[in-house]
Amino acid sequence: VPKVVGLVIGTRPDCISEEIIDYLSVLSKKYFISLEFGVESTLNSTLKKVNRCHTYEETKATYELCKNKGFHLGAHLIIGLPGETKEDLLNHAIEISKLPIDTLKLHHLQIVKQSIMAFQYKNNPENFNLFTSENYIDFITDFVGLLRPDIIIERFVSEAPQDLLIAPKWNGLKNFEIVAKIDQKLAEQNTWQGKFYREDSQLVK
Protein backbone atom coordinates (compact mmCIF):
# COMPACT_ATOMS: atom_id res chain seq x y z
CA VAL A 1 0.00 0.00 0.00
CA PRO A 2 1.52 3.36 -1.00
CA LYS A 3 2.78 5.54 1.88
CA VAL A 4 2.25 2.80 4.47
CA VAL A 5 5.53 2.40 6.35
CA GLY A 6 4.46 -0.07 9.01
CA LEU A 7 1.81 -1.63 11.19
CA VAL A 8 1.12 -1.42 14.91
CA ILE A 9 -1.17 -4.28 15.93
CA GLY A 10 -2.71 -4.54 19.38
CA THR A 11 -4.45 -7.78 20.32
CA ARG A 12 -4.86 -10.51 22.90
CA PRO A 13 -2.07 -13.07 23.32
CA ASP A 14 -4.49 -15.87 22.40
CA CYS A 15 -5.73 -14.21 19.21
CA ILE A 16 -2.71 -14.64 16.96
CA SER A 17 -1.62 -17.78 15.12
CA GLU A 18 1.75 -19.07 13.98
CA GLU A 19 0.55 -18.56 10.40
CA ILE A 20 -0.09 -14.86 11.01
CA ILE A 21 3.19 -14.49 12.89
CA ASP A 22 5.08 -16.01 9.95
CA TYR A 23 3.28 -13.70 7.51
CA LEU A 24 4.06 -10.62 9.60
CA SER A 25 7.66 -11.75 9.90
CA VAL A 26 7.95 -11.63 6.11
CA LEU A 27 6.43 -8.14 6.10
CA SER A 28 8.88 -7.02 8.79
CA LYS A 29 11.73 -7.33 6.31
CA LYS A 30 10.25 -4.36 4.44
CA TYR A 31 7.99 -2.61 6.96
CA PHE A 32 8.05 -1.69 10.63
CA ILE A 33 5.87 -4.21 12.49
CA SER A 34 4.90 -3.71 16.12
CA LEU A 35 2.87 -6.29 18.05
CA GLU A 36 1.35 -5.28 21.37
CA PHE A 37 -0.37 -7.83 23.58
CA GLY A 38 -2.77 -7.25 26.45
CA VAL A 39 -1.00 -9.09 29.25
CA GLU A 40 -3.05 -7.26 31.93
CA SER A 41 -1.80 -9.49 34.78
CA THR A 42 0.83 -12.16 35.36
CA LEU A 43 -1.43 -13.99 37.83
CA ASN A 44 -3.70 -16.73 36.51
CA SER A 45 -6.05 -16.25 39.45
CA THR A 46 -6.60 -12.63 38.41
CA LEU A 47 -6.97 -13.47 34.72
CA LYS A 48 -9.66 -15.97 35.64
CA LYS A 49 -11.40 -13.52 37.98
CA VAL A 50 -11.66 -10.82 35.31
CA ASN A 51 -12.74 -13.36 32.67
CA ARG A 52 -9.76 -12.93 30.34
CA CYS A 53 -10.12 -16.56 29.23
CA HIS A 54 -6.40 -17.08 28.75
CA THR A 55 -3.52 -17.93 31.08
CA TYR A 56 -0.21 -16.22 31.68
CA GLU A 57 1.50 -19.33 30.32
CA GLU A 58 -0.28 -18.71 27.01
CA THR A 59 0.94 -15.12 27.10
CA LYS A 60 4.55 -16.23 27.57
CA ALA A 61 4.20 -18.81 24.80
CA THR A 62 2.96 -16.16 22.38
CA TYR A 63 5.92 -13.90 23.10
CA GLU A 64 8.26 -16.85 22.58
CA LEU A 65 6.72 -17.42 19.15
CA CYS A 66 7.15 -13.75 18.27
CA LYS A 67 10.68 -13.10 19.49
CA ASN A 68 13.54 -12.87 16.98
CA LYS A 69 11.04 -12.46 14.13
CA GLY A 70 11.84 -8.84 13.37
CA PHE A 71 9.01 -7.41 15.45
CA HIS A 72 8.89 -4.57 17.90
CA LEU A 73 7.13 -6.21 20.87
CA GLY A 74 5.01 -4.41 23.45
CA ALA A 75 2.89 -5.30 26.47
CA HIS A 76 -0.07 -3.74 28.26
CA LEU A 77 -0.50 -4.19 32.01
CA ILE A 78 -3.35 -3.11 34.29
CA ILE A 79 -2.29 -1.95 37.74
CA GLY A 80 -4.81 -2.57 40.51
CA LEU A 81 -7.05 -5.41 39.35
CA PRO A 82 -9.31 -6.83 42.10
CA GLY A 83 -7.63 -9.11 44.61
CA GLU A 84 -4.04 -8.15 43.80
CA THR A 85 -1.85 -7.00 46.69
CA LYS A 86 1.02 -4.54 46.47
CA GLU A 87 3.40 -7.50 46.47
CA ASP A 88 1.49 -9.05 43.56
CA LEU A 89 1.71 -5.79 41.64
CA LEU A 90 5.44 -5.41 42.24
CA ASN A 91 5.94 -9.00 41.11
CA HIS A 92 4.38 -8.03 37.79
CA ALA A 93 7.47 -5.88 37.16
CA ILE A 94 9.73 -8.88 37.79
CA GLU A 95 7.69 -11.22 35.59
CA ILE A 96 7.14 -8.70 32.78
CA SER A 97 10.89 -8.10 32.69
CA LYS A 98 11.39 -11.73 31.68
CA LEU A 99 9.35 -11.26 28.50
CA PRO A 100 11.17 -10.32 25.25
CA ILE A 101 9.44 -6.93 25.09
CA ASP A 102 10.67 -3.56 23.89
CA THR A 103 7.90 -1.39 25.32
CA LEU A 104 5.37 -1.39 28.14
CA LYS A 105 2.12 0.53 28.57
CA LEU A 106 0.75 0.75 32.10
CA HIS A 107 -2.92 1.36 32.86
CA HIS A 108 -4.25 2.08 36.34
CA LEU A 109 -7.58 0.37 36.91
CA GLN A 110 -10.51 2.64 36.11
CA ILE A 111 -14.18 1.83 36.64
CA VAL A 112 -16.26 3.06 33.71
CA LYS A 113 -20.02 3.26 33.35
CA GLN A 114 -22.01 0.33 31.96
CA SER A 115 -19.19 -2.18 32.42
CA ILE A 116 -19.30 -5.43 34.37
CA MET A 117 -16.83 -3.95 36.84
CA ALA A 118 -19.08 -0.94 37.34
CA PHE A 119 -21.80 -3.34 38.49
CA GLN A 120 -19.33 -5.22 40.71
CA TYR A 121 -17.95 -1.99 42.15
CA LYS A 122 -21.44 -0.70 42.98
CA ASN A 123 -22.38 -3.90 44.79
CA ASN A 124 -19.04 -4.79 46.41
CA PRO A 125 -16.75 -1.74 46.51
CA GLU A 126 -14.71 -3.39 49.28
CA ASN A 127 -13.33 -5.81 46.66
CA PHE A 128 -11.57 -2.96 44.87
CA ASN A 129 -8.41 -1.23 46.03
CA LEU A 130 -8.40 1.74 43.70
CA PHE A 131 -5.32 3.93 43.85
CA THR A 132 -5.37 7.55 44.89
CA SER A 133 -3.12 9.61 42.63
CA GLU A 134 -0.59 10.01 45.46
CA ASN A 135 -0.49 6.28 46.21
CA TYR A 136 -0.18 5.44 42.53
CA ILE A 137 2.78 7.77 42.09
CA ASP A 138 4.48 6.20 45.13
CA PHE A 139 3.77 2.71 43.81
CA ILE A 140 5.07 3.41 40.31
CA THR A 141 8.31 4.69 41.83
CA ASP A 142 8.81 1.25 43.40
CA PHE A 143 7.57 -0.60 40.31
CA VAL A 144 9.97 0.97 37.82
CA GLY A 145 12.89 0.28 40.14
CA LEU A 146 12.27 -3.45 39.62
CA LEU A 147 11.67 -3.20 35.88
CA ARG A 148 14.27 -4.20 33.29
CA PRO A 149 16.06 -0.95 32.41
CA ASP A 150 15.92 -1.29 28.62
CA ILE A 151 12.11 -1.56 28.47
CA ILE A 152 10.64 1.70 27.16
CA ILE A 153 7.64 2.76 29.24
CA GLU A 154 5.29 4.33 26.71
CA ARG A 155 2.44 5.00 29.13
CA PHE A 156 2.12 5.33 32.90
CA VAL A 157 -1.63 5.90 33.22
CA SER A 158 -4.88 5.62 31.31
CA GLU A 159 -7.37 8.45 30.93
CA ALA A 160 -11.00 7.42 30.52
CA PRO A 161 -13.46 10.12 29.39
CA GLN A 162 -14.70 12.03 32.44
CA ASP A 163 -18.34 11.48 31.50
CA LEU A 164 -17.79 7.70 31.63
CA LEU A 165 -15.43 7.50 34.60
CA ILE A 166 -16.89 6.35 37.92
CA ALA A 167 -13.65 5.99 39.86
CA PRO A 168 -10.93 6.94 40.66
CA LYS A 169 -11.38 10.63 39.82
CA TRP A 170 -7.93 12.01 40.77
CA ASN A 171 -9.34 15.56 40.67
CA GLY A 172 -9.14 15.61 36.90
CA LEU A 173 -5.35 15.25 36.74
CA LYS A 174 -4.13 14.78 33.18
CA ASN A 175 -1.66 12.13 32.01
CA PHE A 176 1.19 14.61 31.56
CA GLU A 177 0.65 15.94 35.09
CA ILE A 178 0.88 12.45 36.58
CA VAL A 179 4.04 11.73 34.58
CA ALA A 180 5.60 14.98 35.82
CA LYS A 181 4.81 13.98 39.41
CA ILE A 182 6.32 10.52 38.84
CA ASP A 183 9.50 12.14 37.50
CA GLN A 184 9.62 14.38 40.55
CA LYS A 185 9.10 11.47 42.95
CA LEU A 186 11.85 9.42 41.26
CA ALA A 187 14.24 12.33 41.68
CA GLU A 188 13.24 12.81 45.33
CA GLN A 189 13.78 9.11 46.05
CA ASN A 190 17.04 9.02 44.07
CA THR A 191 15.78 6.03 42.14
CA TRP A 192 15.34 5.13 38.48
CA GLN A 193 14.11 2.40 36.19
CA GLY A 194 16.06 -0.79 36.79
CA LYS A 195 17.81 0.35 39.97
CA PHE A 196 16.75 -2.86 41.75
CA TYR A 197 16.47 -5.08 38.67
CA ARG A 198 18.38 -8.36 38.69
CA GLU A 199 18.20 -11.05 36.01
CA ASP A 200 17.74 -13.65 38.74
CA SER A 201 15.21 -11.58 40.71
CA GLN A 202 12.90 -13.65 42.88
CA LEU A 203 9.26 -12.89 43.52
CA VAL A 204 8.61 -10.36 46.26
CA LYS A 205 7.23 -12.05 49.39
Annotate each PLM feature.
Residues 47, 51, 82, 122-128:
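Short helix/strand-bridging catalytic loops that position acidic/His residues to coordinate divalent metals
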